[in-house]
Regions:
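Short secondary-structure boundary segments
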Residues: 1-2, 48
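Structural alpha/beta surface segment adjacent to cysteine/selenocysteine redox centers
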Residues: 23-129
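C-terminal cap of thioredoxin/glutaredoxin-like
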Residues: 3-39, 43, 106-107, 111-188
Length: 188
């Protein structure tokens, strides 16, 4: 009889460079374990900037308005850490964008395809956000990324054209608040 899998939940936001870095570090460590199949990893939603625009705007500009002179140092620090994980951040192209629909899509990936699909999609979303200048608030961009991950295009478009998954995302955000999660990434 096989042992039950240990669930690891990662509260994360696609808008967070430290979440991308943390994802890379975590999965490198997990993948190196002989017992990696004993773990089920699920991404949970967290919105660092729920008022971010859709379509997105230049991340550099939004950070400068929010954090002033500190924003450049923040990007340098995150960019330096990212390089160590094989991530090439492009702060000139990166956009600050609403991530609610990306979270709905990640929830759909987990629910209908499983944790492996969710992990694959999260990687593509993070790369689009920080390396490729993608707008993760755009239904077309989200659809393109989901299809590249292996999800059904019609199903993805159906989700994005509706409010489906909204309650689940909100419940995940409320659960994070109930657990006292105030920063991401957080691993539980």
């Amino acid at each position: 009889m096989s042992q039950p899998r240990t669930r690891i939940e990662i509260w994360s936001d696609i808008a967070c460079p430290w979440c991308y870095i943390g994802k890379r570090r975590f999965f490198r460590a997990l993948d190196a374990r002989a017992d990696r199949e004993a773990f089920e990893v699920v991404f949970r939603p967290f919105e660092l900037d729920p008022d971010a625009p859709a379509p997105g705007e230049p991340l550099r500009d939004r950070l400068a308005r929010r954090y002033g002179a500190r924003s450049e140092a923040m990007m340098r620090q995150a960019g330096g850490a990212a390089v160590g994980e094989g991530i090439t951040t492009d702060w000139e192209r990166a956009l600050a964008a609403r991530t609610r629909d990306a979270h709905r899509l990640l929830a759909l990936a987990a629910l209908e395809y499983g944790a492996t699909m969710q992990r694959r999609l999260a990687g593509l979303l993070f790369a689009a956000q920080f390396e490729l200048g993608g707008d993760v608030s755009s239904a077309d961009e989200l659809t393109r990324l989901a299809v590249a991950a292996g999800m059904d295009e019609a199903r993805v478009r159906e989700l994005l054209a509706s409010n489906e998954g909204e309650a689940e995302v909100e419940a995940g955000i409320e659960r994070a608040a109930g657990l006292g999660i105030r920063s991401v990434p957080t691993f539980v």
